[in-house]
C-alpha cells in the first residue's frame, strides 16, 4: 500500500438507513445505548441555551435583512440541534470549515454574533476574523470548503498535531465535484477529517431525492472507503455523540467519516427565496412537529433539568445577544475599499496597486 495511505482495520462497509437517535420526537429517551453519553447537567442545559440563542439570533438576522441592513441572509431555523450538537463536542483547537448556514456552529465556537453580522454586511474582511477561533470564513461557493478542510487535516498530520478538521456542508453540496475530490483524497490519505452533511431535504428548490440514486447520502461513504453514518439531525444529543465518535476516530489516526444529519430547513433557502413555489405547507407543518427545541426542552423536563427559572435565564440571554447583534451591525464602520487589495497577499502586488488606483479614481469621479 502506498506511503501515507494506511487503512484502518475493521472498517465498516455498510450503512444503517435508520438514523442514530437518543431522544425521540416526543422528548423521551430511546433504547439506543451504543451512543449514549453521560454528559454533565451543566452541559445538557448549555446545549439548550445555545439552541435557543441560535434561533433568536437567526430571527434577528432575518429582521435586519428585511430592514435593509443586510443584503442577504441564509436562515437556519430547524437546524439548531444539528449545528449545536456537532460543534459542542469538538476541541477549541479543531478547525471548522463551514458553509453559509452555520450560525449555531459559530456561536458554540465562541465567535461573537457581531462578527457574524458584519461578515454578512460585508464591512469587515468578509469573515476572516473567524480564524482567531480556528474557524474558517463561511464558504458561499458550494462545497469548496471541503477541499480546504482536507488540506488543513493533512497539514495537521505533517505537523503531528492532535487536531481534527470538520467540513460542514449541505445535501446539495454532495453533488459537487469538489466534494468528490475532497472525500476521495481524505480517505486515500487517511486524514483526520470529518464530513458533516446537514441534509435539510432541499438544495434551494432541488429535493434530496434528485441529488443521489444511493439509498442515502451516508451510503456514498462506502465507495470512498470510509465509514458513513446517519443521525437524527433534530436530536442534539445524538448529533453530539455521533460527531464525538467520528472526531475520536480521526484523532486516533483511523481516517475520515461521512456523517449525514437528517434535518429540515423550516425557513427559506435565503431571504431572497420563496419556498412556497416548490414545497407544500403540509410538508413544512409535518417537519415542524419534529422541531428540535421543544423536543429537547421536553427531554430536560423529564430529566428534572428544566425549570421556569432556566427558561427565563435563557430568554434573557437570547434577548441580550440579539441586542448586541443589532448594535454591532448598526455601529459597523464603512468598509475601507483599500482592504479589497491589501488583504490578498502579505505585500500588495503591482497589479493590485494599479487596480486600487483605478477604483479610487472611479470612486472620486462618482462622489
From Swiss-Prot:
An example molecular function term from Gene Ontology annotations: 3-methyl-2-oxobutanoate dehydrogenase (2-methylpropanoyl-transferring) activity
Keyword Magnesium attached: yes
One GO BP annotation of this record: pyruvate decarboxylation to acetyl-CoA
Listed cofactors: Mg(2+); thiamine diphosphate
Keywords recorded for this protein, A-Z: Magnesium, Metal-binding, Oxidoreductase, Thiamine pyrophosphate
EC number(s) recorded for this UniProt protein: 1.2.4.4
InterPro entries per record: Alpha-ketoacid_DH_E1_comp, DH_E1, PdhA/BkdA, THDP-binding
Matching PANTHER family: 2-OXOISOVALERATE DEHYDROGENASE SUBUNIT ALPHA, MITOCHONDRIAL
Function: Component of the branched-chain alpha-ketoacid dehydrogenase (BCKADH) complex, that catalyzes the overall conversion of branched-chain alpha-ketoacids to acyl-CoA and CO(2).
Known partners and oligomeric status: Heteromer of E1 alpha (BkdA) and beta (BkdB) subunits. Part of the BCKADH complex, consisting of multiple copies of BkdA/BkdB (E1), BkdC (E2) and Lpd (E3).
Name of this protein: 3-methyl-2-oxobutanoate dehydrogenase subunit alpha
Annotated source species: Mycobacterium tuberculosis (strain ATCC 25618 / H37Rv)
Gene: bkdA
Amino acid at each position: 500500500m502506498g506511503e501515507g495511505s494506511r487503512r484502518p482495520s475493521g472498517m465498516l462497509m455498510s450503512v444503517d438507513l435508520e438514523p442514530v437517535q437518543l431522544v425521540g420526537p416526543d422528548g423521551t429517551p430511546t433504547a439506543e445505548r451504543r451512543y449514549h453519553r453521560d454528559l454533565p447537567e451543566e452541559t445538557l442545559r448549555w446545549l439548550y441555551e445555545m439552541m435557543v440563542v441560535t434561533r433568536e439570533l437567526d430571527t434577528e438576522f432575518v429582521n435586519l435583512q428585511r430592514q435593509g441592513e443586510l443584503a442577504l441572509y441564509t436562515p437556519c431555523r430547524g437546524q439548531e440541534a444539528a449545528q449545536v450538537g456537532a460543534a459542542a463536542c469538538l476541541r477549541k483547537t479543531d478547525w471548522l470549515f463551514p458553509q453559509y448556514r452555520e450560525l449555531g456552529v459559530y456561536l458554540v465556537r465562541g465567535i461573537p454574533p457581531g462578527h457574524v453580522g458584519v461578515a454578512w454586511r460585508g464591512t469587515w474582511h468578509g469573515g476572516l476574523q473567524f480564524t482567531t477561533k480556528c474557524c474558517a470564513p463561511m464558504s458561499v461557493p458550494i462545497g469548496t470548503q471541503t477541499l480546504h478542510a482536507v488540506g488543513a487535516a493533512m497539514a495537521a498530520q505533517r505537523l503531528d498535531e492532535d487536531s481534527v478538521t470538520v467540513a460542514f456542508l449541505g445535501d446539495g453540496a454532495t453533488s459537487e465535484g469538489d466534494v468528490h475530490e475532497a472525500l476521495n483524497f481524505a480517505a486515500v490519505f487517511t486524514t483526520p477529517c470529518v464530513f458533516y452533511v446537514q441534509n435539510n431535504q432541499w438544495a434551494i428548490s432541488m429535493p434530496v431525492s434528485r441529488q443521489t440514486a444511493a439509498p442515502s447520502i451516508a451510503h456514498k461513504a462506502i465507495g470512498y472507503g470510509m465509514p458513513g453514518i446517519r443521525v437524527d439531525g433534530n436530536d442534539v444529543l445524538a448529533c453530539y455523540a455521533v460527531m464525538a465518535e467520528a472526531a475520536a476516530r480521526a484523532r486516533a489516526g483511523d481516517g475520515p467519516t461521512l456523517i449525514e444529519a437528517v434535518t429540515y430547513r423550516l425557513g427559506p433557502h435565503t431571504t431572497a427565496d420563496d419556498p412556497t413555489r416548490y414545497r407544500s405547507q403540509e410538508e413544512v407543518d409535518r417537519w415542524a412537529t419534529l422541531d428540535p427545541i421543544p423536543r429537547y426542552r421536553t427531554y430536560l423536563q423529564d430529566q428534572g433539568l428544566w425549570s421556569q427559572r432556566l427558561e427565563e435565564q435563557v430568554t434573557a440571554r437570547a434577548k441580550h445577544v440579539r441586542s448586541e447583534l443589532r448594535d454591532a451591525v448598526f455601529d459597523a464602520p464603512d468598509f475601507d475599499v483599500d482592504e479589497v487589495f491589501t488583504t490578498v497577499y502579505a505585500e500588495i502586488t503591482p497589479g493590485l496597486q494599479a487596480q486600487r488606483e483605478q477604483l479610487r479614481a472611479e470612486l472620486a469621479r462618482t462622489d
